[in-house]
């Protein structure tokens, strides 16, 4: 085999390997990509049925219901224009409350029910962990202040 043919085969093999690696990376990226939709987009049919995505909004006041099994929770996410019924099986975050922001990840069923596999509670910029709030309260009670 001539040197030129060897070089062409080597370059061709290298390009084929690069294309295969790029295809694998794109495939893995596409499988792990999770889109975010609002309740209005979901209600308008812009969200894929049966595929994993996230919905964010406010937990509608008075919508939280716990099933008899004590593990399944049903609630409604709204963006004040449309509502999406959500069912979730598991323990909810401590910050999850009615009237507060939440993001749920899961799939939309053909019946319009969103089946969440993960619930994330949002908090505002004034959030303080309970331990820090307690320490601050104790400091105020003992009148401990930092002097400059």
Curated annotation (Swiss-Prot):
Residues on Cytoplasmic side: 1-7
Membrane topology: Single-pass type II membrane protein
List of residues binding heme: 123, 127
One function term, GO molecular function aspect: metal ion binding
Residue intervals on the Periplasmic side: 29-148
A single BP term in Gene Ontology: cytochrome complex assembly
Keyword Iron-sulfur: no
Organism superkingdom: Bacteria
Membrane-spanning segments: 8-28
Cellular-component GO terms for this entry: plasma membrane
Record family assignment: Belongs to the CcmE/CycJ family.
Function: Heme chaperone required for the biogenesis of c-type cytochromes. Transiently binds heme delivered by CcmC and transfers the heme to apo-cytochromes in a process facilitated by CcmF and CcmH.
Descriptive protein name: Cytochrome c-type biogenesis protein CcmE
Organism: Azoarcus sp. (strain BH72)
Lineage, broadest ranks: Bacteria, Pseudomonadati, Pseudomonadota, Betaproteobacteria, Rhodocyclales
Chain's gene name: ccmE
């Amino acid at each position: 085999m001539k040197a030129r043919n060897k070089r062409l085969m080597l370059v061709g093999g290298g390009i084929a390997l690069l294309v295969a690696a790029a295809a694998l990376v794109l495939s893995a990226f596409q499988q792990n990509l999770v889109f975010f939709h609002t309740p209005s987009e979901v209600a308008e049919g812009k969200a894929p049925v049966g595929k994993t995505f996230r919905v964010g909004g406010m937990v509608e006041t008075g919508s939280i219901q716990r099933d008899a099994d004590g593990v399944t929770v049903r609630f409604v996410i709204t963006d004040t224009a449309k509502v999406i019924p959500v069912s979730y099986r598991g323990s909810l975050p401590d910050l999850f409350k009615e009237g507060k922001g939440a993001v749920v990840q899961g799939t939309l069923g053909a019946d319009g029910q969103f089946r969440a596999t993960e619930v994330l509670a949002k908090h505002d910029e004034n959030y303080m962990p309970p331990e820090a709030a307690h320490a601050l309260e104790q400091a105020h009670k003992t009148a401990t202040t930092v002097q400059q």
